[in-house]
Amino acid sequence: NGDGGEVTPSSQEIEQAVRLTQLPPLDAEDRALFVDRMLPADLAQEAYASGAYQPLRSWAHAAFAATVRSSSEAVEITLVADGLTKVLRFANDGTLAVSYRWEAAAVPHGVVFATEVSLSHPLELRTTPSAETWSFPIATVAKSERGLDQTVQGESVTLRWPAAAGGASIAVG
């Protein structure tokens, strides 16, 4: 002791003091750019952000057939899987455009098509048609000598369109 009466807590005392008031959000799927899902119409943003939901359909682990086309202006990668076509266009000027087509007739009324983008830095996303945007911080929780530390790693941005639209596009940058 000898330092003015302050007592350093024991490792057992620190361990007992480590408590979460709520569980951190669960990532049911890997974080990446353009993780595509069909979501229920009544899904609340809070449930989505916490990971406490089931997508109606997810292409996160789908095996896509890929076709690559190159021109003097851009490289286009067309991905097709299970009723979804996604085209990634990488232009020579460094811009990226992503376009989607899905089978709207096969989707129940009110369902939402969504794509999630996990970002470490802000990025401008322009959508056609205009998308509803949900965002929340991506954070990790780790135990340290101070207790539990929460570190923000980036931001999740989810772009949402009525599935009845049958398609959408995003310009990045």
Where does each model-flagged region fall?
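Short acidic, flexible loop segments centered on an aromatic residue
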Residues: 112-121
